[in-house]
A protein has these predicted regions:
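Catalytic palm active-site di-aspartate
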Residues: 14-18, 45-54, 80, 106-114, ...
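Inter-domain linker/hinge segments that demarcate the starts of reverse transcriptase
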Residues: 1-3, 26-37, 149-166, 231
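Conserved, non-catalytic sequence blocks in retroelement Pol enzymes and Pol-derived host proteins
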Residues: 15-24, 36-41, 52-56, 69-75, ...
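Conserved pre-catalytic core of RNA-dependent polymerases
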Residues: 1-107, 142
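Short, conserved micro-motifs composed of acidic
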Residues: 95, 154, 161, 169-204
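Basic, alpha-helical interaction scaffolds
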Residues: 132, 197-269
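Short, residue-level hotspots on alpha-helical faces of the histone-fold
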Residues: 4, 82, 119-123, 256-260, ...
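Catalytic palm subdomain of template-directed nucleic-acid polymerases
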Residues: 54-70, 127, 138-164
Length: 280
């Protein structure tokens, strides 16, 4: 009911924890943008943002204030607040326990309301460029003509301002950037600096929502990875068969373990692979 009430107000580039939207939808939308830039002889400068301990740093009072801003009834806001309130934790070492500590932040794990709380928190993260979100996975894209000066540093600074206002933090060591385009044009683009003045690492490939994205937007790396995973699991399947495991159980193992490895998000990449890769 809560999602139905506030869904029309959600950022349309948020794909996580919402019925009818998935990692596949998010990936297709992003890759369409990057392929379009490539087709137009433009550059796509992409920032893959990692929030440090994203769910653990969520401040309950900020989430509640944003729920109120969505215009939800007071009774619903109080119910949601009661879900977050009065949570405690303590540490056990051997037979010794620490004192209980009241939690004013962090999202409960294993509950659907946890991811929902995070997308409510991050909904107003709106930069001056295209931003895709899948719960706490955030991808920032800037499209550039070959002679255009990049503004990604400005967008990164906007992101830092948002994290400061919402008591979040960017993990600069895990945040990466990738530029799709010609090598000559990429070399001319200055490095992106973190808030600590360190360079954000520029990579040629990145695992995004379970898919390996390469700078040339080809799928050799991704296919090699999934074939390697599937091969080891098929080897284990053969061992199970030699051990006399019933056929029904072997089939269940294939359907639940091997097939998802090969088919995950296949609408994103399968139509772009070569016939040789398909035969692999």
């Amino acid at each position: 009911w809560i999602v139905g009430k506030i869904l029309p107000s959600f950022d349309q580039k948020q794909f996580g924890a919402i019925k009818g939207r998935s990692t596949t939808h998010a990936l297709i939308d992003m890759l369409h943008t990057w392929h379009s830039a490539q087709d137009q002889q433009k550059l796509a400068r992409i920032l893959f943002v990692d929030f440090a301990k994203a769910f653990d740093r969520v401040d309950h009072s900020i989430v509640i204030s944003k729920l109120i801003a969505f215009g939800l009834p007071g009774s619903v806001v109080k119910w949601f607040a009661s879900f977050l309130a009065n949570r405690q934790q303590r540490v056990k070492i051997g037979c010794a326990f620490s004192n209980w500590l009241q939690l004013n932040g962090s999202m409960p794990q294993g509950s659907w309301l946890g991811p929902l709380s995070f997308i409510i928190l991050i909904d107003d993260l709106k930069l001056s460029c295209l931003t895709h979100k899948f719960v706490d996975d955030t991808t920032v894209t800037e499209i550039l003509s070959r002679r255009q000066q990049s503004s990604m540093q400005q967008y990164y600074n906007e992101l830092v301002d948002w994290t400061d206002s919402n008591l979040m933090r960017i993990n600069d060591s895990k945040t990466k950037e990738m530029i799709i385009g010609s090598d000559a044009a990429i070399v001319a683009i200055p490095p992106l600096l973190s808030s600590g003045s360190d360079q954000i690492e520029r990579v040629d490939r990145f695992k995004l929502l379970g898919i390996t994205i390469s700078r040339d937007l080809k799928w050799s790396d991704h296919i090699d990875i999934i074939c390697s995973k599937a091969s080891s699991r098929i080897h284990f399947l053969k061992q199970l068969k030699r051990s006399g495991v019933p056929t029904a159980d072997l089939l269940h193992y294939y359907v639940s373990v091997i097939r998802p490895t090969l088919e995950y998000a296949c609408p994103v990449w399968h139509s772009s692979i070569t016939s040789e890769q398909s035969d692999t």
